[in-house]
Every structure is written in C-alpha cells, then in structure tokens.
A protein has these predicted regions:
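N-terminal cap/lid segment of alpha/beta-hydrolase-fold proteins
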Residues: 1-14
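Conserved HGGG/HGGXW glycine-rich cap/lid loop of the alpha/beta-hydrolase fold
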Residues: 16-67
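Active-site loop/oxyanion-hole signature of alpha/beta-hydrolase fold enzymes
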Residues: 45, 49, 58-99
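Conserved loop-alpha-helix segment in the C-terminal half of the alpha/beta-hydrolase fold
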Residues: 48, 215-248, 254
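Gly/Ala-rich beta-loop-alpha elbow adjacent to hydrolase catalytic centers
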Residues: 100, 104, 108
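Flexible "cap/lid" loop of the alpha/beta hydrolase fold
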Residues: 113, 121-151
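Conserved alpha/beta-hydrolase catalytic His-Asp/Glu region
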Residues: 133-138, 153-211
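Catalytic active-site module of serine/aspartate enzymes centered on a nucleophile-bearing elbow/loop
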Residues: 240-273
Length: 273
C-alpha cells in the first residue's frame, strides 16, 4: 500500500492519508474517496499497486471512518469534500482526478461543485444522484436511523466476519483478507456511521449535477443490490459520463478485485485523455 502519513490542517485537524508521489513530476494526481462504513484501504486496496505506476495517488479516510478525523460536529458530506481540498493544499496538490466509490461519489461531486478549479475530472463508482427519491427508500432510511445505533452496538467481530464471508466468494483473491477487513471495519466510529447515513439520505445532486462540466466516467455495477443500476445510469446521464458497466454487486472491489481494478484504470485513462 502507499505510504501513510498524518496531515495536519489548520482549523480542521489531523487527517490520516496515503500519498504516493509518482517519480514523474508531471504525473496527474488521483484522489481516492471511499464509501460509507468503509475506509480508503478496504475500498481501494485492489487498485493501489496499478495506479501508483502511472499516477500520484492520494487516499483519504473520511471523518469517523477508519483512521479518519474524530469530531463532535455533525457529519456533513460538504465537510468531507472541503477536507480533501484542504489536505491537497497542505501537500501542494493543485488538482486531482477524484475517484468516488459509493458515498465517495457525492464527496467527489461536491469537491467539483465547491472547488471548481481543483477537480480536473471525476470517476464515479457504484453511486447515485440521490438515495431517497421513492417512498420506499425514505421509509428504509427512517427505519435505519432508529435501528442503526442499536445494531452497531450489538455487532461483534464474529458477525462482521460472517457478513464478509457471505459476500466474498472463495475463489476471490480477497477471500484470504477477511481478518484484516474485519479489523479495518471495526475502526469506524458508530455515532458517525449513523450521521453519515443520515447525510446520504438527504443528498440530492439532481438540481446541479449537469453543471459540473468536467470529464466524467461512471463505473456501473450491473448487479448492485444497494445502489440500483438505474440510479447509477441516471447519474451518468446527468453528468454526461462515459459509462463502464461491470458485472458485479456493490462490493465488486472485494468479490472481483481484478475486474474492479481494470475498470478504474480504464475510467481514469478515459477522463484524462
């Protein structure tokens, strides 16, 4: 994995990041933005080795996730977007291709919206314009807000391991990583996870997604049970994105890591051309 470091940002705090600077000083920078309840490593471990050969790579653990910033403030996607740009300032990075996975998609899009000149292009993976357009979705979020805090308190390492075991086929190269994945998931702050879910439930980029105006690619997971493929296609249409469709569920990065890596590499290449 790329080397890790703590980046201190005035008025914000200390952030755990991975940053690998390419030997080519002119190599573009790719910022990897992870999903809800994940962290940079468990979302992007399959792609690190390939990306560092061609790009400088920045990976950030968002607030309350993994080794991310702990704060008493209510979780906001906008704060996460601003965090990444503030980290870029400290590292002397002028612009990035923002690769957003699931929740990382909204964070990447908000970076582009709020910091126009800092995002060269977007790669949006297994994500959507919104998650609450239907009554059923809104009901599920409401139930989740009530149940989630209790569920997280009762979740044991054994239950997490059982969940991961059920999601990763034995044939996957990631199957042997189960103990590590469990330990990484346990780093998350349960209060922040609940807050982040609430923030996602309120996110709606439909009024402004078409105005971003940057090269965009959308990696659509065609068997996704968490973010419906039709929602992913709606995002791609709104952002005029090049679509790369792959045969996988929401955790395709664990289930088919080689397929996921190939799609990410292809998507970045297309938006950088």
């Amino acid at each position: 994995m790329p080397n890790s470091r703590i980046v201190s940002v005035p008025q914000r705090g200390e952030f755990f990041v991975r940053y690998a600077k390419n030997e080519n000083a002119n190599a573009p920078v790719v910022a990897l933005l992870h999903g809800w309840t994940g962290n940079a490593d468990i979302n992007f471990f399959p792609v690190y080795a390939e990306l560092v050969q061609h790009y400088s790579v920045l990976a950030v653990d968002h607030r309350g996730h993994g080794r991310g910033l702990r704060t008493n403030d209510r979780f906001a996607l906008e704060d996460c977007a601003d965090d990444v740009v503030a980290i870029m300032d400290q590292l002397g990075i002028s612009s990035v291709t923002a690769v957003g996975y699931s929740m990382g998609g909204p964070i990447a899009m908000l970076m582009s919206k709020r910091h126009t000149n800092r995002v060269h292009s977007l790669v949006l993976c297994a994500t959507a314009l919104e998650w609450s357009a239907t009554r059923g979705e809104r009901t599920r979020w409401k139930i989740g807000r009530v149940v989630s805090p209790v569920f997280r308190l009762l979740t044991t390492p054994r239950l997490i391991d059982r969940y991961i075991k059920g999601k990763i086929p034995r044939a996957s190269s990631a199957a042997t990583l189960r103990p590590w994945l469990v330990s990484e998931i346990r780093r998350n702050d349960s209060w922040t996870m609940n807050q982040a879910g609430r923030a996602l439930s309120k996110y709606d980029a439909r009024p402004w997604a078409a105005t971003l105006g940057v090269p965009t690619a959308s990696i659509v997971t065609s068997r996704d049970s968490l973010v419906a493929p039709n929602k992913q296609h709606a995002l791609a249409q709104a952002t005029q994105a090049t679509v790369i469709e792959i045969d996988g569920d929401h955790l395709v990065n664990w289930q088919k890591p080689e397929l996921f890596t190939a799609a990410v590499v292809d998507a970045i290449r297309q938006v950088r051309e």
